[in-house]
Amino acid sequence: MGIPAAFRWLSTKYPKIISPVVEEKALVMEDGTVVPVDATQPNPNGEEFDNLYLDMNGIVHPCSHPEDRPAPSDEEEMMVEVFKYTERVVNMVRPRKLLMIAVADGVAPRAKMNQQRSRRFRAAQDAKEKEEDKQQLLKMLQKEKGSTAKEEPIETVVKKAFDSNSITPGTPFMDILAASLRYWCAYKLNTDPAWAKMKVIISDATVPGEGEHKIMEFVRSQRNSPEHDPNTRHVIYGLDADLIMLGLATHEPHFRVLREDVFFQQGKARMCKLCGQKGHDERNCRGEAKEKAGEFDEKDKAEPLKPFIWLHVSILREYLAIELNIPNLPFRWDLERAIDDWVFMCFFVGNDFLPHLPALEIRENGIETLMAIWKDNLPVMGGYVTKDGHVDLDRAQYILSGLAKQEDSIFRRRKETEDRREAGFKRRKLNNQQGNNRGGAHDSPLSGRGGRKGAPEANGPPVGMNLFPVASIPKPVITHDMVVNRANVANKSAASVLKSQIQSLVAQTQEKPEGDEPKEENPEAKTPPSALGKRKAELIEEGTATASDAASDTETPATTSSEEGPIDTVRLWEEGYADRYYEQKFKVDAKDIAFRHKVARAYVEGLAWVLMYYFQGCPSWEWFYPYHYAPFAADFVDLGKMKISFEKGRISRPFEQLMSVLPAASRHAIPEVFHDLMTQEDSPILDFYPEDFEIDLNGKKMSWQGIALLPFIEMPRLLDAMKTKSHLLSAEDKARNAPGHDVLLISDSHPGLYEDISSHFYSKKQAVPEFKLDPKRSDGLSGKVRKIEGYVPHGSLVYPLERNTMPDVDYDRSMSVNYDMPTSSHIHKSMLLRGLKMPTPALDRSDVDFVRSKGRGAGRSFGGVPLRNNYNGGGRGDRINYAGGPPRGGGGGGRGRGGYQQDRGYGNGYGGGGGSGGGGGGGGYGNGYGGYQQPAAPGQQSWQPPPPPGYPGFGVGVPPPPPPAHASGGGYNQGYGNQGYGGQNYRNDRYPPGPPPHGGYQGGGYPGGGYQGGGHQGGYQGQYHPPHGQSQDRRHDNS
């Protein structure tokens, strides 16, 4: 998912969702014999798993260009690495029922192609620049070494990198990968006892859809089956952050995400990408050949394997149950719907289909800001924002309007933070320079000891001067970083170079003592992550976010210095930023307000598209967001009047996607008949493939954070141009361009299913070409299977690659059939299934306190402070309220810190820090929700939300009846972040039928909105019956 640093943010905010994987390693005997892992044994992690889903993008990318070892020399070596990595993951999880492998993304929706196009063009551009730097390094090294160079040619040191753009549907590489994985899975079914009863589904790149979304489509399809076991335990492997959101969207609590611990030994030097040696990175590469450890390098020590971690979706659900719960809503509380709303709000901060809103950054508590807005508005919205993957636009308007209230403040606060960081860097840089200067004076040879006392000889050196032969002075070592920096200087504009020179001269005359030589600085040159593929880019972004959040003191000039970066002419922190934004980014008149609303409507369409894509599957294969930039929150108006609908549209063919997303530099992955369309001057679509394009940093510092301003593909033009060449395709090319099918592989050891398939397809009867699986005989798998044309069972299994690295199998005991997922007329419901046994709660009271303490003021600390509520006129006011609706009254609840009353009988009066208006929380502000103390269910802690009927431990349903005796409460006494959801006293025998009244004389800012300033009493205006012996006057009715 396109949320940089999302995984790190989640694991920091909710620490218990992460745990290390216990991995059993193969044993190496003294004689070198390797004893493999016995995966038939119980899982060492203490829990058995049913289904494992592999998003192979997260395996293919690290195997094709690893960080800790040299890259594979060819595709066959790469396939072997893929086999090893996959087997390691399978042995960790040990699935007992099913393994699904999404070999790679198939043809993607058009909305995704734009992002793929940007990444691949950037990757090609970065690879070109990197190759030019390599060649320049070679020339400089050859010139320097001359006749003293070693016998081996230097060209063998620098290798050409694998083109990651080949990992795209329709390329020959993807054909090789799919065939290799089909062989390997069949081989394991024949030889590994742990695979004997496992079903394997392979969905290769010929099957349309992104890998992770094909996996989720399978999960939803099985979930809709009446025979589905609701307690199935799922594990999905992948490096994408959106796997977490997709796991939540399944509403399957027994779900885990498996991934590498990408932060393991983060500070350790990586292997050089240029020469393949350890101990330095490519910035400091000197182009020297590797020294062998032993005659054949057999003594070279292998790096320790990177550990893996679990992300527990069930524990994340527990955290969200605490964070999102709002007691005493005027409608039924439903955790499943609240989780869907939370996932929807995360889309605003980033996704792969839309640019994020300018005011929202995950590093600036963007998600917490939206959560605060959602909490304030939920009671007045009348329900949840989403339902089963559909968005209620009237309620979404509340969220965006609440964000618009603090948009200006967020931009100003962001600028202040950047300025402080910049000033801190300059201060540290100056201190370091002054320290170096003092050290240089202290260590001067003139002050050295030794030599004769007295005046020096007239023609001799000063006394104490240490003399060295000129030939002994080492020459400056040429490194790759020097080449890159010289190229960067050469690419600067004349004005930028002149400015830098003037500034350096001024600095030297003002700061440098006489006699000091100027020192050349080599700012760190980072490899843009787009060159490493989608998954690698996200991991680098996570690491960058971590560095910026946790250790801003260590930032380098390349990341912080505004002197080297372009000037931000939009200046979001200054008045008039919206006009400048639309003039410069969209090239439209600043007074064209209708255009702003048009952009906002397209963005809302995109949000609706993304939500349906995550919860129901792709709503349209042709829709896309037609702008490079997002609108402001203030531009979203009258959303409730919009009518959004999508047409399924046409699914592109693989070659059409290749022509849509690949640059001309990667045309080797495209059939040769189309090459002229990408390169020739007379091509009608030549403008789709610019060699040079603008990168708009859009206020960022690093080039990889910028926006590639590429022209959007006009699909009718592209298709018309391709039609003129399609008849020239070879039969092999046409086969690669055809849509494919999922394949199901089983062993003859699988009871029931193997017999059913054999009798239907390969017996003398052979009645039908397809049949529906019986879940009772297939161990829970639903769907249809079809015979593969030309496939003959019980033949030989042949290794598909040339060097025969893996053996052939003479008698293949596995069987392969085409597989179709079951279809259903029912939509995927956001609900827990009947018969589900919830996982044992993992959080205790200390975890709840931790979440609430971390949430104190969350979403209001960046931009929301020190905004004040100006509605209460003259009072001190409090932090701004995000809830929609006009102000009605004010008043100083508690210590006179005002609020205002909402017009739906819901009290939003802000109580003071304790006292009568403390809102039950002893501080913060009282939102007047009028909580009441629920009795604890059996096995449930008193602080947990009430469970729904039949599902202990989670507050997703109506609360149980109140106890017979009257219970006084403070609701959630600490509130959420000490926001003080107020309490009330009630008696069970005095309530009328229906939900208890909301509001209450003890809570919500005394009483529920403040009474000292004449504000209206808060709370939902329901019927109230005081306990016996108490006066009705204590309610402080509105007057």
Curated annotation (Swiss-Prot):
Family matches, as Pfam families: XRN_M, XRN_N
Known EC number: 3.1.13.-
Keywords for the protein's UniProt record, in alphabetical order: Coiled coil, Exonuclease, Hydrolase, Metal-binding, mRNA processing, Nuclease, Nucleus, rRNA processing, Transcription, Transcription regulation, Transcription termination, Zinc, Zinc-finger
Gene Ontology CC: one annotated term: nucleus
GO BP terms, alphabetized: DNA-templated transcription termination; mRNA processing; nuclear-transcribed mRNA catabolic process; positive regulation of chromosome segregation; rapid tRNA decay; rRNA processing
Disulphide bonds in the chain: none
Keyword Transcription regulation found: yes
Subcellular location(s) per record: Nucleus
Residue segments, region Disordered: 414-462, 508-565, 869-907, 930-1039
Main location: nucleus
Known function: Possesses 5'->3' exoribonuclease activity. Required for the processing of nuclear mRNA and rRNA precursors. May promote the termination of transcription by RNA polymerase II. Essential for vegetative cell growth and chromosome segregation.
Family: Belongs to the 5'-3' exonuclease family. XRN2/RAT1 subfamily.
Subunit structure of this chain's protein: Interacts with RAI1; the interaction is direct, stabilizes RAT1 protein structure and may stimulate its exoribonuclease activity. The interaction also stimulates RAI1 pyrophosphohydrolase activity, probably by recruiting it to mRNA substrates.
Name used for this protein in its record: 5'-3' exoribonuclease 2
Record organism: Chaetomium globosum (strain ATCC 6205 / CBS 148.51 / DSM 1962 / NBRC 6347 / NRRL 1970) (Soil fungus)
